[in-house]
Amino acid sequence: MVSLLAADLPQTDAHPKRLQRVLLISTYELGHQPFGLAEPIAWLRRAGHDVRALDLAVEQLDEQAVRDADLVAVYLPMHTATRLAARLIPRVRQTNPTAHLAAYGLYAPLQASYLRGLGVNTILGGEFEEGLTMLAAGGRPPSTVSLARLAFLPPDRSGLPALDRYGHVRMPDGERRIAGYVEATRGCKHT
């Protein structure tokens, strides 16, 4: 496996055709703030891109953000998210017909032909942060599914909905506490 550091990726001035305005969208992540948004946000911002993110599980689609984006990438970590995205993608394409549309996450390669039929230009699976960053820089990711060993950056959660809008635990005394989770692997044995 190849080891790749975020610092090894192309920096701001290297690619004149870069897609500078990036919109990442998640449709569903089991009531969690999506790591699949926070980690690529860190990579893309480090490379100098203007990144917005929307979690449609807890907020509405911002059509102005869609119109403003050069690259719109939809995160597909599971089947439910993919089904929800299938209704979203035509709306995104209609709102911004010139944007490059990507789908990334474990279920993107599994549904590649279906997603391409909906108008998706690029499909990324496996370790997708490098591919998204290359795509935003105006390049072409080397493969659909990357198995590269990445050196993850601290996730950038700025601009994402507050944690109190996600899953919580109701304690026996009625107190509501924010619930967290740890993602030790990407995906499960079924993907």
Feature-to-residue mapping (PLM):
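Acidic, low-complexity intrinsically disordered segments
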Residues: V2-T191
